[in-house]
């Protein structure tokens, strides 16, 4: 086994404001009562403004490859995405097996309503008119057949292809680290050059693109509907900039099938979204492979990169989140180096 490099991430949950920390989050609202999941292989298409045309055909979303492998194609539509909620009663839009690959699309925020031409006033209205609801458009849920509570879901990011445009904004006087500075808010739309993998933020200011999903997570164990904003033991809105193609997420499973979502797609991000947002985009292709890991339970998510492991901690109290991240790091080191937790803590120093 080679050297281990550790990066710890902490998330602070506070009420309604973006604050210091790698990921800064809104307060978790209470659950909305909901029924048990309907674990059917299809989802009824009921797009507003169109007549119902019947259930989507699962077989028409699956491509069989040589060697017995399967690739599932999941477009982002109003029928395959949710706006701002995780809900473990949501009917799965796709059913796959452990080891399968999924090629999925994602939307821009608020069901593709934040696109070039949308004003900051309109963006503010999308936030203030729907209290408790997150801004993220989430593709899913995806039901993984073998996944059961107590298992771990391993999600490997194979490839990410963004759209050619993106945005950065902060809502007037409400969120981010600068609400008093930008009381009128601001929105900026950007062209993403996918050949050079850069964007010109300002004349002469070029930002390299490093796309990653800001949100990827599974259903909570508690029934009900929850905002997409806070992360937690189910992963979710982690906003970890190192979660790029070539890395792997390990997340505990809490409900049968795991129920996997992804969205909040980023083209690039600093180490924290201090003005509220990163370079927000949508993905033409988010290519992932899912595997179910049995007999190796986790209590919090981890990310494996080609050169490091990332551990996490989540709490409303930043100090408690930091303590969780430290404990998770010591736990990982003790597992991989077969040393005591006490020696692992010394090694961390």
Segments (PLM) and residue ranges:
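Gram-negative bacterial Sec-dependent N-terminal signal peptides
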Residues: 4-25
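N-terminal pre-domain segments of enzymes
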Residues: 28-80
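N-terminal, Lys/Arg-enriched amphipathic/low-complexity engagement segments
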Residues: 57-130
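Short, structured beta-strand/loop micro-motifs enriched in basic residues and often containing a Trp
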Residues: 77-87, 131-139, 226-234
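Short, Lys/Arg- and Gly-enriched loop/turn segments at beta-strand edges
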Residues: 109-120, 160-170, 257-267
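Intrinsically disordered, low-complexity linker/loop segments enriched in Gly/Pro
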Residues: 136, 159-244
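Conserved mixed alpha/beta catalytic, RNA-binding, or beta-rich assembly cores of soluble enzyme
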Residues: 211-237, 241-319
